[in-house]
């Protein structure tokens, strides 16, 4: 049972109080260049802009935001190419659990710590489900493995 009005989630009889964060729209995040944010993982040198839609058009300029996922709160899902002419997620394969991910937007910056790095099926979208916290999920292809995707997931730290 969820009670979003009081910004808490009820689960198994206990209440987990979530920090109140107003809902965010695309217009709140849209920059003059069309991007909605910037994702970076300094340890591996990954830094790229984020555009709405996990489309070839978006991923030719940076990372593509999965439209059904959170924009700033919840589970923010990002897709990107790692080879070819636009390898914005090329360094994702070097990420390790514990690395820090930053997501900078017009309304603020969130900082996350990587909790999962692994290969998932290209049909497995469960890592983009809402988990009751703020997290970011980055997904890219794996070279010569067309049925797999590399998934990096990080949970917000404050």
Model region roles, listed by residue range:
Residues 1-158:
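Solvent-exposed, non-transmembrane regions of membrane-associated and secreted proteins
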């Amino acid at each position: 049972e969820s009670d979003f009005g009081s910004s808490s989630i009820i689960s198994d009889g206990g209440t987990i109080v979530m920090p109140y964060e107003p809902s965010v729209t695309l217009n709140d995040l849209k920059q003059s260049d069309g991007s909605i944010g910037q994702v970076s993982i300094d340890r591996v040198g990954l830094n790229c802009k984020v555009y709405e839609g996990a489309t070839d058009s978006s991923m030719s300029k940076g990372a593509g935001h999965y439209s059904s996922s959170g924009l700033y709160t919840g589970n923010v899902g990002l897709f990107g190419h790692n080879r070819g002419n636009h390898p914005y997620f090329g360094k994702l394969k070097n990420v390790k659990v514990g690395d820090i991910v930053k997501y900078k937007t017009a309304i603020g910056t969130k900082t996350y710590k990587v909790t999962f790095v692994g290969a998932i099926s290209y049909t497995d979208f469960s890592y983009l489900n809402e988990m009751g916290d703020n997290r970011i999920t980055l997904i890219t292809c794996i070279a010569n493995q067309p049925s797999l995707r590399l998934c990096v997931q990080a949970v917000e730290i404050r």
